[in-house]
Amino acid sequence: MTLLALGINHKTAPVSLRERVSFSPDKLDQALDSLLAQPMVQGGVVLSTCNRTELYLSVEERDDLQEALIRWLCDYHNLNEDDLRNSLYWHQDNDAVSHLMRVASGLDSLVLGEPQILGQVKKAFADSQKGHMKASELERMFQKSFSVAKRVRTETDIGASAVSVAFAACTLARQIFESLSTVTVLLVGAGETIELVTRHLREHKVQKMIIANRTRERAQILADEVGAEVIALSDIDERLREADIIISSTASPLPIIGKGMVERALKSRRNQPMLLVDIAVPRDVEPEVGKLANAYLYSVDDLQSIISHNLAQRKAAAVEAETIVAQEASEFMAWLRAQSASETIRDYRSQAEQVRDELTAKALAALEQGGDAQTIMQDLAWKLTNRLIHAPTKSLQQAARDGDNERLNILRDSLGLE
């Protein structure tokens, strides 16, 4: 049995190839059935995300294994093998285990340390168990990878610092406000960045969110997901005073929030502080707003400096994480080898017990027929000895004939001979 990991990712293949090799969720069961129908495959898990498509397999070793699996992947997706071969990576046994642990821990992600990949790996594993998983070694490898990812999160700072603009904006808000559960957040725009911001805010228990957008339809879809209120851009002037935090990201060519607008809001708030995070380019908030007392304005450049600092921290944490992964992968492979030895020991013991039972039964039958007890016991001992040493004796003789001193010494050591 051999453990394999093969696939492509954002580092080895452009999106034009990754999208052709991806497995859609509605066809995943069919793909797993087809994969497990291959004679050398004992168990398989398919991980398919926007940044990677990977097969994790338990297989029987054979000479054409790599070619057979590449051929299956290309046939399934109607690809030319040459298009895929140069982008494909291939990991075996310890390297396969280490790769999965790195993936689950976010060490191989486009955004170093991102947490979403662990959920994606868990889902891929769960999907494989719906009547598809056959190999216990593969199941153990995934379960171990989940615990390693948790250990990496717990023992290092790999996920502690924001490395996306959306996450950095929310981290900044959490640093300024002791609790986000009591604040009101005004979100200007309804694009992808604001969508990510709303998810982070919801995770931090923000109760009141207001979304201002040029088109109500898109904003309403997002608002329905997070329980927010939708207003028009023209309503910002009137509603700004309610907001403790304003996060803006639109494609407007001109500022949407001006100095005068914020001055009026601060006056209505009796100068309670406001945090304004402008992550738009061009800027949505006039730079002069930052000069107002109690208005704390941060631009996308300010966030980028936070992200750069945090990315350096994550890279330092990644060194610790890699050490954990290397240690855990080595220990897992040692455990796997021990399991293989346990099966051999069990088979050897079972064989010896069969010989014992067979010869004991014959001896008892001879005693019942009135045979001489001493003669029967001596015969039992002689036959038992010969049967048990027959296979080791043949191996010793063959090693001697082959001039294989190393094997001969291993056999002597195994038999406890000085």
Swiss-Prot record:
Signal sequence residues: none
Subunit structure: Homodimer.
Record text about domains: Possesses an unusual extended V-shaped dimeric structure with each monomer consisting of three distinct domains arranged along a curved 'spinal' alpha-helix. The N-terminal catalytic domain specifically recognizes the glutamate moiety of the substrate. The second domain is the NADPH-binding domain, and the third C-terminal domain is responsible for dimerization.
PANTHER family reported in the protein's UniProt record: GLUTAMYL-TRNA REDUCTASE
Cross-referenced SUPFAM superfamilies: Glutamyl tRNA-reductase catalytic, N-terminal domain (SSF69742), Glutamyl tRNA-reductase dimerization domain (SSF69075), NAD(P)-binding Rossmann-fold domains (SSF51735)
Protein name from the UniProt record: Glutamyl-tRNA reductase
Site residues by UniProt (Important for activity): H99
CDD domains: NAD_bind_Glutamyl_tRNA_reduct
Active site: C50 (nucleophile)
Note: During catalysis, the active site Cys acts as a nucleophile attacking the alpha-carbonyl group of tRNA-bound glutamate with the formation of a thioester intermediate between enzyme and glutamate, and the concomitant release of tRNA(Glu). The thioester intermediate is finally reduced by direct hydride transfer from NADPH, to form the product GSA.
Organism field: Escherichia coli O1:K1 / APEC
InterPro entries to which the protein is assigned, alphabetical: 4pyrrol_synth_GluRdtase (IPR000343), 4pyrrol_synth_GluRdtase_dimer (IPR015896), 4pyrrol_synth_GluRdtase_N (IPR015895), GluRdtase_CS (IPR018214), GluRdtase_dimer_dom_sf (IPR036453), GluRdtase_N_sf (IPR036343), NAD(P)-bd_dom_sf (IPR036291), Shikm_DH/Glu-tRNA_Rdtase (IPR006151)
EC number: 1.2.1.70
Residues bound to substrate: T49, C50, N51, R52, S109, E114, P115, Q116, Q120
Keywords: NADP, Oxidoreductase, Porphyrin biosynthesis
Catalysed reaction, written as an equation: (S)-4-amino-5-oxopentanoate + tRNA(Glu) + NADP(+) = L-glutamyl-tRNA(Glu) + NADPH + H(+)
NCBIfam families, A to Z: hemA (TIGR01035)
Gene3D superfamilies: Glutamyl-tRNA reductase, N-terminal domain, NAD(P)-binding Rossmann-like Domain
GO MF entries: glutamyl-tRNA reductase activity; NADP binding
Gene Ontology biological process terms in this record: protoporphyrinogen IX biosynthetic process from glutamate
Function: Catalyzes the NADPH-dependent reduction of glutamyl-tRNA(Glu) to glutamate 1-semialdehyde (GSA).
